[in-house]
Curated annotation (Swiss-Prot):
Assembly with partners or alone: Contains catalytic and regulatory chains.
Protein name, UniProt field: Aspartate carbamoyltransferase regulatory chain
Cofactor binding comment, as recorded: Binds 1 zinc ion per subunit.
Annotated binding of Zn(2+), by residue: 109, 114, 138, 141
The encoding gene: pyrI
Primary role: Involved in allosteric regulation of aspartate carbamoyltransferase.
Keyword Cell cycle applies: no
Taxonomic source organism: Vibrio vulnificus (strain CMCP6)
Residues annotated as signal peptide: none
GO biological process: 'de novo' pyrimidine nucleobase biosynthetic process; pyrimidine nucleotide biosynthetic process
Amino acid sequence: MNKETKLQVEAIKNGTVIDHIPAQVGIKVLKLFDMHNSSQRVTIGLNLPSSALGNKDLLKIENVFINEEQASKLALYAPHATVNQIEDYQVVKKLALELPEFVSDVFECPNTNCITHNEPVASNFRVFEKKGDVRLKCKYCEKVFSREIVTER
């Protein structure tokens, strides 16, 4: 018996589709863009089967378009995700994700002795890759952290 199974997630007319998000990261992306407070319809797929990743997360946000700056922030969480802008059910633009050089006022410095915890200054990190791993260096305490440690906060 040959059984063919197909996962179907409803298409959106206009908006953004973020695909190939690593499993367990989709909720963090929702919070990063404050989508969980949006009045627009958001379709969330968690732990979906993926031939490339094993499992993946997927987000479809109707009537919301992610800009280049937001795509750079997304790259910190999901550097290999794909971002498609949809208009009238068609992909009209694909955003390439690139790590930003700097990221400000997005994450809290994990170093509890950092000045950002006691003074009214925005956090600021330099972003770089080392041996394929994304690292963030705090502008103030100059400590270097892995992406996973910083984005968990």
